[in-house]
């Protein structure tokens, strides 16, 4: 806890320096920020030789940039002609990539093939998720509770549940009778702050939390150790029981003061410089604390040892990106960390390398009133490479950057030692007419990721919606009005080429190999103007790279699937030729999963819902206009004695003209003879709190399909989808 005591001392010093000279807002901690124009992305990073050098580096850079409002006081905004505006940077979701070949498809089964595994990007590189199985038990985390369900008998049995630490985004790995749960929390959960309400945690500071859970007694699962690391948890990967956890940290415990008027700025600047001068190593470098089962501190220290910290030759910000190594086969410890002074957002790992990428805006020499194109052109992607071969600590290897922004984890892939990156030029929200997408191939040379090949001119005026790298081939989907699927030949990394292209309406935001030259896309259908109309799954024949074809498709109007942004929600079970997609429709109120068959094209095999026992049934004693109900909205005419209301819907009485206008907004025309000004009219729309719970994941054990929702687990027969069992949470 030394870090927080030092923080309190610095705050007292700052208050003493400024209390008589100026009026300030309440002293509070803000995330350190700075003028992004001063950032230079230098590819070669060098390690520090001592802790004094680390502290001196941070102090010198901060003293050069601190002002009366702290370190630049926040992001810089620009206003463009036409009213568009943009923030300084945009984060992409964390994730991974794939080196699977099309011929094999993507394995998702357990070691014996009798159950499905997590839908990972790289076979053998596990990813944490909210559900895991070994074929005999199903472990899941829903609403912060870890549940253990035994599925070895005739009936599934919920043996135990454990309330986890307050936080969010709980995901876990399992190794034998132990689970390692990763989550994002805040400092309220740390004993020092929880025990004394007078001590407020630093404003905006978050912690990454790892909890080791003993599963040996399912009736009495216990958290035996907890590791807390300063910063935001990005992602983790596990290879042969060795976990690499990636965290991005920033110095958010600098209690800068702020002047109440212009005349006090000099005094505030002096106070803020004093705060930086008084800062310690723990102020800048993230710390960890390890607790035992009773919440007592076991050990604490810096996440990254000083000689394992790396910095660029020129200023690159105050963030620390750390990769911590944990061993699943032993008790949870502090781990061995490696770090670079840089930001991190998107994580990808092969069996031997881990990459962390960041979308960054570099606004050097931007005019005071830039146009949109000038702003968009300044987006870059910075990438840092770490060696994770073996079970030792990760080793920093190289860095590099390219123009443009990447979409997510699938934009990165390592093959034969080279890194392939798919990016779109410009800002993530931009649809510039001359923008294009490209694939760039980087290789490591003397600590630098250098470009050795590229292919562009994909999707003019569009941006990437999905990418899948499969061996020497990449599949790229761009979209604005139509969905071009590009097939890219990467067999020659120095001279990649686009070998084929297919244009169809809509887009795929997730691509999955099915083997035998088949590729499945999940996304949205769209009309000729690019307006999305509902969820869509498309089966592509890509056996001829020069002539990709759409074999068949399946759609559901006014709906979406979590698979569009969460690949872990996807299930492909090759032994039964099925794909399972969670589906939510905002018009028909369908909440469940759709099972598609892939053995002869693409066809719907059935639907699964976790039907609630207390769900109100459809129906009303009023006259329902069926034509409106089909669009997801119910408009009904009620007599004076009618109770009104519609089961499972929220109803509100409206004047006839307003009801008709609302119906038109939903795409339904109501004729004059259907509504009269004197009528009592009720407008009803789906109340999802009363509907079926959303299905989040699915898995297969033997001949049973299991699905997970907030409400519990449900077992359906693979053959026919008959409901077999339910385990309610």
Protein language model regions, located:
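Beta-sheet-rich non-transmembrane sensory/scaffold domains
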Residues: 18-729
């Amino acid at each position: 806890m030394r870090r927080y005591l030092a923080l309190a001392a610095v705050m007292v010093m700052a208050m003493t320096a400024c209390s008589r000279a100026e009026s300030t807002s309440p002293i509070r901690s803000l995330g350190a920020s700075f003028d992004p124009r001063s950032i230079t992305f230098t590819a070669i990073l060098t390690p520090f030789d001592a802790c004094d050098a680390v502290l001196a580096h941070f102090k010198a850079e901060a003293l050069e940039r601190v002002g009366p409002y702290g370190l630049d006081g926040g992001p810089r905004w620009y206003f463009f002609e036409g009213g568009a505006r943009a923030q300084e940077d945009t984060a992409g979701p964390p994730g991974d990539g794939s080196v699977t070949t099309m011929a094999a498809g993507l394995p998702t089964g357990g070691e014996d093939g009798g159950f499905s595994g997590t839908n990972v990007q790289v076979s053998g590189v596990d990813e944490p998720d909210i559900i895991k199985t070994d074929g005999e038990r199903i472990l899941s985390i829903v609403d912060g509770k870890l549940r253990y369900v035994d599925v070895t008998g005739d009936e599934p049995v919920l043996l135990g549940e454990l309330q986890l630490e307050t936080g969010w985004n709980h995901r876990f790995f399992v190794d034998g009778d132990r689970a390692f749960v990763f989550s994002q929390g805040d400092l309220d959960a740390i004993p020092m702050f929880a025990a004394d309400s007078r001590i407020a945690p630093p404003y905006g500071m978050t912690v990454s939390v790892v909890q080791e859970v003993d599963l040996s007694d399912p009736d009495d699962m216990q958290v035996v150790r907890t590791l807390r690391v300063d910063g935001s948890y990005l992602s983790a990967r596990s290879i042969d029981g060795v976990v690499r956890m990636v965290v991005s940290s920033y110095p958010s415990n600098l209690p800068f003061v702020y002047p109440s008027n212009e005349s006090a700025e000099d005094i505030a600047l002096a106070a803020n410089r004093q705060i930086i001068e008084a800062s310690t190593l723990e102020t800048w470098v993230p710390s960890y604390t390890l607790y035992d089962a009773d919440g007592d501190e076991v050990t604490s220290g810096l996440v990254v040892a000083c000689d394992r910290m790396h910095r660029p030759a020129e200023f690159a910000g105050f963030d620390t990106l750390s990769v911590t190594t944990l061993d699943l086969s032993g008790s949870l410890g502090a781990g061995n960390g490696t770090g670079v002074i840089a930001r991190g957002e998107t994580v990808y790992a092969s069996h031997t390398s881990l990459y962390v990428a960041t979308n960054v805006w570099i606004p050097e020499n931007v005019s005071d009133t830039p146009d949109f194109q000038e702003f968009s052109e300044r987006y870059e992607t910075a990438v840092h490479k770490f060696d994770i071969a073996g079970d030792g600590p990760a080793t920093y290897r190289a860095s590099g950057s390219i123009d443009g922004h990447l979409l997510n984890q699938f934009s990165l892939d390592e093959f034969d030692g080279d890194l392939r990156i798919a990016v779109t030029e410009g800002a993530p929200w931009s649809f510039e007419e001359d923008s294009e997408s490209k694939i760039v191939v980087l290789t490591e040379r003397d600590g630098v990721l250098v470009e050795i090949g590229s292919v562009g001119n994909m999707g003019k005026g569009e941006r990437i919606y999905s990418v899948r790298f499969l061996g020497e081939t990449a599949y790229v989907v761009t979209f604005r009005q139509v969905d071009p699927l590009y097939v890219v030949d990467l067999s020659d990394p120095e001279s990649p080429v686009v070998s084929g292209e297919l244009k169809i309406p809509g887009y795929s935001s997730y691509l999955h190999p099915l083997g035998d030259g088949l590729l499945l896309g999940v996304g949205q259908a769209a009309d000729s103007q690019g307006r999305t109309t509902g969820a869509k799954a498309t089966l592509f024949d890509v056996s001829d790279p020069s002539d990709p074809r759409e074999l068949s498709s399946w759609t559901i109007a006014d709906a979406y699937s979590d698979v569009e942004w969460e690949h872990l929600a996807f299930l492909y079970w090759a032994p039964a030729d099925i794909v399972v997609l969670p589906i939510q429709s905002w018009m028909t109120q369908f909440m469940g999963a759709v099972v598609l068959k892939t053995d002869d094209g693409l066809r719907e095999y059935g639907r699964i819902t976790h039907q609630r026992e207390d769900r109100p049934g459809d129906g009303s004693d009023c006259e329902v206009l069926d034509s409106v109900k089909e669009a997801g909205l119910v408009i009904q005419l009620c007599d004076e004695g009618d109770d009104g209301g519609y089961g499972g819907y929220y109803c509100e009485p409206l004047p006839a003209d307003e009801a008709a206008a609302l119906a038109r907004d939903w795409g339904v025309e109501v004729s004059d003879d259907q509504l009269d000004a004197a009528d009592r009219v009720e407008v009803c729309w789906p109340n999802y709190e009363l509907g079926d719970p959303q299905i989040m994941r699915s898995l297969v054990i033997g001949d049973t399909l299991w699905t997970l929702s907030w409400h519990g687990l449900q077992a359906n027969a693979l053959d026919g989808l008959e409901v077999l069992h339910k385990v309610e949470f």
